[in-house]
């Protein structure tokens, strides 16, 4: 699937469409804090399976019970529709 770079108008509405995500330097970023490492790693596993199915992979880190995810599309050198779709799907995986 070819990625489409987001327009300035689309970028301005990201905060409304994606609760919890922030926009910085052509990247979407979000951080989650879990009760422990096992919960954090379980969340990362679910995200990994989702990302693989969508063929769009995050940049991320895990420090004990904290997971940070950044999304960008290298092919278009910025944010694309693929980043929005993955962020929306990740939000549906959230615990609680």
Swiss-Prot record:
Pfam families listed in its UniProt record: Pterin_4a
InterPro entries, A to Z: PCD_sf, Pterin_deHydtase
Superkingdom of origin organism: Bacteria
CDD domains: PCD_DCoH_subfamily_b (cd00914)
Alphabetical keyword list: Lyase
Entry keyword Lyase: yes
One GO BP: tetrahydrobiopterin biosynthetic process
Protein name, as recorded: Putative pterin-4-alpha-carbinolamine dehydratase
Organism name: Prochlorococcus marinus (strain MIT 9313)
Source taxonomy: Bacteria, Bacillati, Cyanobacteriota, Cyanophyceae, Synechococcales
């Amino acid at each position: 699937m070819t990625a489409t770079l987001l327009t300035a108008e689309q970028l301005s509405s990201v905060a409304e469409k994606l609760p919890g995500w922030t926009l910085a330097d052509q990247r979407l970023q979000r951080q989650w804090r879990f009760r422990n490492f096992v919960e954090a790693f379980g969340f990362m596993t679910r995200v990994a399976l989702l990302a693989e199915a969508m063929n769009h992979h995050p940049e991320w880190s895990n420090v004990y019970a904290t997971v940070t995810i950044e999304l960008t599309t290298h092919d278009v050198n910025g944010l694309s529709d693929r980043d929005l779709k993955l962020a929306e799907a990740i939000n549906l995986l959230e615990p609680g």
